[in-house]
Amino acid sequence: MAFSTLKSDRERGFLDGHFLIAMPGMADGNFTRSVVYVCAHTTAGAMGFIINRTQPVKFADILLHLDLIDQNDAIMLPDHARNFPIQCGGPVETGRGFVLHSDDYLSDSSIPVSDDISLTATLDIVRAISDGRGPARATMLLGYAGWGPGQLEAEIANNGWLNCPASEDLIFDPVLDNKYDRALALIGISPATLSAEAGHA
């Protein structure tokens, strides 16, 4: 599913607003021990973002690349911008940036993902974050995860993923190392138990 076709269809039992948690036997190395926040899931496919994968890029690098600041400005960036989290959102369009954020910031280009979370992919929100006018909670992701029609359903049927309702706190927590274990805990599963079950599958 392309980002431009992002829509929601919760009434038909799709998984938008849920986490996908990779099983230990996940065949695609892009998703090993990943937690994916599903933003849209319809008969046309699905798209979402990995929320526990680091990206060796700083927010200042993004601003410089977009010509929003110069080197002198980069040195003077306030702490909130200097420390703003950048993550790897997935293997599709890795050069493109997306901001998941709380709904206290909305622009004409913002797309509601849930009652409390929106998605914006324009320069306006990048400028707002750098100026201290951005949302209270946000993270920038480079790239996204996408599935074609029926692809995600097939992966779930083949035991590639577990799923559960998403946690806003987990999405925006800047500590990434334990997100996989914490996502499993949402459904009462320990990593050790999951690994043992997978080994006997």
Swiss-Prot record:
Gene3D superfamilies: VC0467-like. InterPro entries: AlgH-like (IPR003774). GO terms for cellular component: cytosol. It holds the Pfam family DUF179. It comes from the Bacteria. Belongs to the UPF0301 (AlgH) family. This is UPF0301 protein Avi_1069. It comes from Allorhizobium ampelinum (strain ATCC BAA-846 / DSM 112012 / S4) (Agrobacterium vitis (strain S4)).
